[in-house]
């Protein structure tokens, strides 16, 4: 696109593309020579001339600083091509299409941000629910007690002795409990001895003549029962004396 100072393309002596299209002699100070080459400038300048006119473009470039004229020529050529492609909107149609694309992309960005926020909120809610469930489970473990363990860990069982079935309206002392125990034992032994003696006299066992029980041939049974009763009486008397002391 560069041309020599005399208005002709360097090394060829041909006019610039604009002058070639206009079929005129290219002057040394041609304003179009630096921007329209002799080979490809004619077709490019044709669209500009058809839309804006050569004289109008020349006046426009004269009002633009030299260091900005190249960019001005590029934009003028773009506007001319857009106007030929779309006589109604020209380059505005391209601008409108780009604006629609920007708006569509912005809406997609907003949707993605909303989805991300929703996922973050859901994740935070799940984490909070999991934490609350864990805390409730740990609290339940700390406060819950096994029924068997509680039955054997009460203060009463640790510190209170067991005296059998005690009536709260009639408390029993250890001495009276021991006396009752010896009395029950003595009465049981006496009852057993009487039963054995009765069946021994009748000639049969505990369950009759043919049953299983204490049969004849054991004359020392009554004697051993008497010894046992006397021993229990002595033990009972000794225990009572020890408790009184």
Curated annotation (Swiss-Prot):
Going by the UniProt record, its keywords in alphabetical order are: Nucleus
What InterPro entries does this protein's entry cite? Answer: LOB
Gene Ontology, cellular component aspect: nucleus
For the null mutant, the annotation states: Reduced number of lateral roots.
Check the record and name the Pfam families matching this protein: LOB
Origin, by domain of life?
Answer: Eukaryota
Q: Where is this region: Disordered?
A: 162-183
State any GO BP term from the record.
positive regulation of DNA-templated transcription
Tell me what induces its expression.
Answer: By auxin.
Annotated coiled-coil segments of the chain: none
Domain named LOB is located at 14-116
- Compartments, record wording: Nucleus
Where in the body, by tissue, does this protein show up?
Expressed in roots and faintly in shoots.
Family under the similarity heading: Belongs to the LOB domain-containing protein family.
Q: How does it assemble?
A: Homodimer and heterodimer with LBD18.
Annotated function: Transcriptional activator. Involved in lateral root formation. Regulated by the transcriptional activators ARF7 and ARF19. Functions in the initiation and emergence of lateral roots, in conjunction with LBD18, downstream of ARF7 and ARF19. Acts downstream of the auxin influx carriers AUX1 and LAX1 in the regulation of lateral root initiation and development.
Protein name (Swiss-Prot/TrEMBL): LOB domain-containing protein 16
Q: What is the lineage of its organism?
A: Eukaryota, Viridiplantae, Streptophyta, Embryophyta, Tracheophyta
